């Protein structure tokens, strides 16, 4: 919604976060890899936002590269939970205020504990959802961390060397 979007922009502005906005035609959920292709951006720069629920019934937000998979054990450990599981797609809006494909760690309904995959620390910039379908924002990983009050953590599956 517009108010959610305005709230995000307020958070970014309040934190004096410079960002670049990308818009593209989109009226339904599309795979994140397709979004990267549409924007002509390398997959490594785009990150998706996943929402989970822990044993404690608390919600947790994880931001990971679009081509990677969340390691549930590492994710749970990073937030001090025994286990976490993905929330049901139908619950995304109720929990976050966003819709599937438009979910971002900035400006959710409530402030949830957020972990950003440590791979983002190596990047100068990253691209995440702008809070609605058809909008992506580019910002520094440190700025996403600040605006989401998140922490960097090792939360994705690693291929055995």
Can you annotate each of these PLM segments?
Residues 38, 67-68, 76-81, 131, ...:
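Short, solvent-exposed amphipathic alpha-helical segments in soluble enzyme
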Residues 97-161:
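Acidic and generally charged, gly/proline-rich low-complexity regions
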